[in-house]
Amino acid sequence: MIKSKIVLLSALVSCALIPGCKEENKTHVSIEFMHSSVEQERQAVISKLIARFEKENPGITVKQVPVEEDAYNTKVITLSRSGSLPEVIETSHDYAKVMDKEQLIDRKAVATVISNVGEGAFYDGVLRIVRTEDGSAWTGVPVSAWIGGIWYRKDVLAKAGLEEPKNWQQLLDVAQKLNDPANKKYGIALPTAESVLTEQSFSQFALSNQANVFNAEGKITLDTPEMMQALTYYRDLAANTMPGSNDIMEVKDAFMNGTAPMAIYSTYILPAVIKEGDPKNVGFVVPTEKNSAVYGMLTSLTITAGQKTEETEAAEKFVTFMEQADNIADWVMMSPGAALPVNKAVVTTATWKDNDVIKALGELPNQLISELPNIQVFGAVGDKNFTRMGDVTGSGVVSSMVHNVTVGKADLSTTLQASQKKLDELIEQH
């Protein structure tokens, strides 16, 4: 880290009398690793990984800096202002865009690690999500991901004589046939609140219809025929969900307690499904119309800018080490099933193959991994990732638009035009 080092004269004198001491001091370097694993059991896993790394690299010490997710943004800002950012930071691909915009990422160091690991080590489509806005670099080295889609109870669909829905129309048909509001049973648990989850959920349908918030030139493209079709569809689908504003808890609870046999949620529903005792009864499909679109959130390790050369080199070694098969497997398996590997090597390890959760899920983990190439997110167009998408999500315009037409029964065309105008004004300010 960038700190002024005060060395006592007596220490220098005593060191001069010890053979080899001068060389050791010169070569030893300490770096910090900031992450969001505040739970003790996760810190224990990371401690073992660090101990393994330090044994292989006796000249480097790695100190953990666990930070609650809610405090992450504030912590990064505070540390960057004081010139004391940790050399390695765990970050979502969304937050990495913000860091890159503020020039807090050492793009060259990140590229060095990806070169060390090999671009081919990652599943197709993964590195595309961590591309910088100009498409010339990466914002971090991917370590895991979670994806969202449609979960369904196989037995409920089978009992009703319904097959797994493969496209928009089939999904709507299944939801309508299973919808029984008079008995407080609903066709699908669908996010409709003014929340990030609603934006993420709706984005899958929009992107599967080739509707994006930005075009390749960085212009807002909300008020388009493709977006209108997606919004119309989402409203029709929402007619078969629970009344009111549904967010994370409402959607998850409805699926888990049997109120709805289908739900749009992330892979983080799987721990509850496993606890329930019959995970093979749960199927997964993704919104598909003109193409398949999976919402995905990538977690990366990024290397911060402005560090001393030896600290940056140590950080590169540490992140490269973390991508080795057994190490990255230990990282991913802190959340088995919920967190998906993005490095192909994970599934070859005993850590993955022998895990009870992975075994219990049968073919589902492989199916989920196979969806990684289909990850699409608002603001990513080709090889470009527009950093202003963070401002769009922060404004809540998209989720409010969806909420207003589903829960509020607002006119679609008017709402779409008003939302386009709000985002145009927002982008002009930034």
Q: Model-derived features: where do they sit?
A:
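Short, well-ordered beta-strand elements
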Residues: 27-40, 60-65, 88, 139, ...
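Extracytoplasmic/periplasmic substrate-recognition and gating elements
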Residues: 51, 136, 228, 232, ...
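Extracytoplasmic "Venus flytrap"/periplasmic binding protein-like
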Residues: 52-122, 129, 159-166, 261-262, ...
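Hinge/lid segment of periplasmic solute-binding proteins
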Residues: 93-147, 172, 198-201, 282-285, ...
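Short, solvent-exposed loop/beta-turn-alpha elements that line the ligand-binding surface or hinge
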Residues: 109-122, 192, 209-229, 275-277, ...
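C-terminal capping/gating helix-and-loop segments adjacent to ligand/active sites or protein-protein/ligand interfaces
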Residues: 133, 359-419
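Extracytoplasmic/periplasmic solute-binding protein
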Residues: 135-143, 148, 172-219, 260
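Glycine-centered hinge/linker elements that transmit conformational signals in sensory
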Residues: 174-177, 181, 217-245
